[in-house]
Amino acid sequence: MKFVIESISKNSGRLGHLRIREGGPDLKTPLLLQTTKGGSIPWLAGDVFEHQVSQEPQVLELTLSNMGHMADALQQWNNQGRGVSDYVGFPGNPNLLLLRDPCETTPSGSNDRDIQPLFTRRGRESLTAETYIEMVAKIQPDIFQGLSDADTNAESSKKRAQKSVDRTEKFMQYIYEQSGKVRGTLLAPIVGGYNTFARTQSIKHAREQPAESYGGYVLEGFHNNGLSATSLDTSKLLPIVEHCVKQLEEDKPRIIPGAYTPLTVLELIRLGIDVFDTSYAYCATHNFKALTFTFVKNEKEDKPFLDITDDTIKEEFTPLLRDCSCLTCQKHTRAYLHHLYKTNELLGPILLMIHNLHHYMAFFERIREAVANDTLPALTELVKTQNGKSSSDFSIVQNTKVISKATMSKGFVAAAV
C-alpha cells in the first residue's frame, strides 16, 4: 500500500492519494469505503451497484464478524490464485478487513486477558491472537486491522480504557511478529476510549514498531458501533481525535470506521482523518430514512432526512430529493417508496439504498472539492444549518415501525423490533 499526501491546509484537512495494490487504481482521500455484509453491499447485487450507483473502483469494507465462517473456503479459493474480492462478486476491487461490523451494535463485555470476543450471527466466538492471524491468513485481504480491544465509549471508566490498551498491546505484539503470514498491509489499532493518557500509550506502542511493519492506523473505541455512532457528543470526541492525530505520522493514512453523521465527518476531516465508510447510509436505509441533506447553497431550507414511513408523503408524486440524478429519484416518487414499505416489498430498500449511497458518495465528492479549495469550514456551516438559521440533527433513531402480515392492509403499526 502506498499513500501520498497531495496537500495539507490549516482549516480543511488534507488531500491524498491511496494505492492499495501494485498497479491498482489511484484512490483520492478523503476516501469512502463501501460497507458490506459478508462481502455484499446490503440490498444491492454487484451488477446493480455497478450500473446504478458507481462504475468507479470501490474499496470493499469487509468484517471478520461477517466473513469469519468463510475463512476455510476462502483459503481454497486463494490457493487457486484468486482473491477475496473475486469471491464476493467484485473482481478487481481492493478490500479492507475490519474486526467488527460498524453497522451493528457490538455487545459490551465478555473480555478476557488472552481472548477477544467476536460477535457473529452464530453467536459469540473467542479469538486469540493466534487464531485471529490464522483466519486473516486464510482470507488474505489487501488491508487488515490488528486485533484490538475496542470495548469502550464515552461512559467507560479510566480502568476499562487502560485495560483496552494493555490487552491490545499484548495482542499486537504477536500480530506484528506474525503479520508476514498475510500478504496485505497491517493497520495498527489505536484504542484507549476517551482517556488521553491511554490513547498516547496506544500510539507509543505502535510507533515503537519498525515503520515498515504497518501501513496506517485505525482509530477505534469511541462508540459501540451501530446507531451509537450517530449520536456521539462531538465536544468529547473531537478533542480526543485531535490529541491522537497530532502524535501520528503524516505519511500514514488514518481510518475511523463507524456511522458518523455528515457533520461529524466534516469535523474529523478537518482534524486530518482520511478514510471513512458508508455505514451511515446503511443505518439510514435500515431505519427507513432517505438522505436529503444538502451540501449545495440555495435559498430553500432543507432537512437531513425524509422518513418514507410517514403517511404525509403518500400522495407526494415528487422525487426523494430534487435535482438528484440517481435511478430512484429519476424514475420513482416519494409516494411510490412509501407504498413499497406499506406493502413490505423488497424493492423498497433496494431503491432507498441506491439513493442513499449515491447521495453520500456525491457528498464525499463535494468534500474533496472543498478540501482542495480550502473551503471546508464554509461547507461545514452549510451542512450544519441546511440553508436555515439553526443546527440540524443528523442522529438516527431506531425506527420501531414494522409491518405485520396480519395488518398489512392497515399499513405500519407501532411495535418493538
UniProtKB/Swiss-Prot annotation:
Main location: cytoplasm
GO BP annotations listed: tRNA-guanine transglycosylation
Family: Belongs to the queuine tRNA-ribosyltransferase family. QTRT2 subfamily.
Keywords, ordered alphabetically: Cytoplasm, Metal-binding, tRNA processing, Zinc
Zinc keyword on record: yes
Chain residues that bind Zn(2+): C324, C326, C329, H355
Task performed by this protein: Non-catalytic subunit of the queuine tRNA-ribosyltransferase (TGT) that catalyzes the base-exchange of a guanine (G) residue with queuine (Q) at position 34 (anticodon wobble position) in tRNAs with GU(N) anticodons (tRNA-Asp, -Asn, -His and -Tyr), resulting in the hypermodified nucleoside queuosine (7-(((4,5-cis-dihydroxy-2-cyclopenten-1-yl)amino)methyl)-7-deazaguanosine).
Cofactor(s) essential for the protein: Zn(2+)
Cofactor note: Binds 1 zinc ion per subunit.
Compartment(s) where it occurs, according to its Swiss-Prot or TrEMBL record: Cytoplasm
The name this protein goes by in its record: Queuine tRNA-ribosyltransferase accessory subunit 2
